[in-house]
């Protein structure tokens, strides 16, 4: 038998390579830190923009200027993982690049917080554990001079159309899901509150004088419900797990990995909650995402946009097998529906 030449196969291979389908619409993720192009000590804030235009702010914290920060743009939803001041925003950045990456120059944002200032300025919905939503709703009321209403809902009772006409409350409990869509979109962004293992007490400086007097004799703070993370399901298929501040816990496997199946995650560092070994294990053995975004470093984590040698961030990144990217301030990353970073990731 004489073998036939495979000449005709080459053009077919070339055609197959040339017609690989494009990645499709992407979710844009933009960190808002204290120093452009770096991941710094106090950096927390992150904006997620769905292909349909829904824009979500996660943990405004202290690396923003407040409600008038020009980097924000439109914000439809404000997320808050827990009540600590570095997430709620008991301080604000005095100016972009003020101070150093390790020690940025901050000023008080009490009693209103940066989260409330942004929600008030942007007419955003407060999407978080009920107690925190109610607390921030009163701060929004103080800013705007009128009570903060519940967010209008659609026929399903847990769906919302953005933009809202005014700041509003969309609090929920652990496990609760709300959907946010633009008027002409077929689908919306689904946001589910998931467990975290941490503390969620509010700084006394943010409380009323009467409440402070009640707590100070026993050196107590006020808990605002359980801490949380989020699973955000975008319309292009990206499923992003936002860990919040948390230690390793069993619900990461049962609730987050097995049920929600995220394909990307934002992992908060911080010595009080997570070790390098446990952080790497969460990424590589529990969640197993296509991409891990490192945030909340509690150190000057980068130099010229690269992990600072000898830092905890560099050490943990080196331990992970997943693709690791730093949440560099002002650098917009783009993610496809499989959790792959297609642009903006070093």
Annotate each language-model stretch with its function.
Residues 1-7:
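Bacterial N-terminal signal peptides that target proteins for export
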Residues 15-16:
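C-terminal motif of bacterial Sec signal peptides marking the signal peptidase cleavage site
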Residues 20-71, 156-257, 334-346:
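Core dinuclear metal-dependent hydrolase active-site scaffold
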Residues 32-35, 58-61, 81-84, 129-131, ...:
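Active-site-proximal beta-strand/loop segments in catalytic clefts of secreted hydrolases
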Residues 37-42, 64-65, 84-89, 132-137, ...:
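Active-site environment of divalent metal-dependent phosphoester hydrolases
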Residues 53-57, 61-136, 142-148, 155-156, ...:
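Active-site metal-binding motif and surrounding structural segment of the metallo-beta-lactamase
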Residues 117-185, 279-346:
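Binuclear metal-ion centers of metallo-dependent hydrolases, dominated by the metallo-beta-lactamase
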Residues 265-281:
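A short, conserved beta-to-alpha structural element at the edge of catalytic cores
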């Amino acid at each position: 038998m004489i073998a036939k030449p495979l000449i005709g196969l080459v053009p077919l291979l070339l055609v197959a390579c040339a017609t690989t389908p494009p990645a499709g619409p992407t979710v844009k993720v933009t960190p808002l830190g204290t120093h452009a192009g770096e991941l710094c000590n106090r950096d927390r804030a992150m904006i997620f923009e769905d292909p349909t235009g829904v824009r979500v702010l996660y943990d405004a914290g202290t690396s923003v200027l407040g409600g008038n920060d020009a980097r924000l743009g439109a914000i439809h939803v404000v997320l808050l993982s827990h009540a600590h001041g570095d997430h709620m925003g008991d301080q604000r950045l005095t100016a972009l690049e003020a101070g150093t990456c390790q020690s940025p120059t901050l000023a008080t944002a009490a009693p209103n917080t940066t989260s409330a200032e942004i929600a008030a300025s942007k007419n955003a919905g407060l999407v978080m554990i009920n107690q925190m939503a109610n607390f921030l709703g009163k701060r929004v009321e103080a800013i705007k001079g009128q009570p903060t209403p519940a967010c209008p809902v659609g026929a399903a009772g847990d769906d919302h159309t953005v933009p809202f006409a005014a700041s509003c409350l969309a609090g929920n409990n652990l496990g609760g899901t709300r959907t946010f869509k633009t008027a002409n979109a077929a689908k919306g962004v689904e946001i589910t509150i998931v467990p975290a293992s941490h503390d969620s007490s509010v700084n006394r400086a943010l409380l009323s004088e009467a409440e402070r007097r009640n707590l100070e004799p026993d050196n107590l703070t006020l808990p605002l419900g359980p801490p949380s993370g989020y699973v955000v399901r975008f319309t292009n298929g990206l499923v992003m797990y936002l860990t919040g501040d948390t230690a390793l816990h069993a619900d990461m496997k049962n609730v987050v990995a097995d049920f929600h199946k995220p394909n990307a995650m934002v992992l908060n560092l911080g010595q009080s909650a997570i070790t390098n070994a446990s952080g790497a294990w969460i990424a590589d053995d529990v969640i197993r995402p296509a991409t891990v975004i490192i945030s909340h470093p509690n150190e000057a984590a980068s130099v010229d946009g690269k992990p600072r040698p000898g830092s905890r961030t560099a050490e943990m990144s080196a331990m992970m097998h997943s693709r690791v990217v730093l949440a560099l301030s002002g650098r917009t990353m783009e993610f496809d529906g499989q959790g792959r970073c297609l642009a903006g990731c070093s």
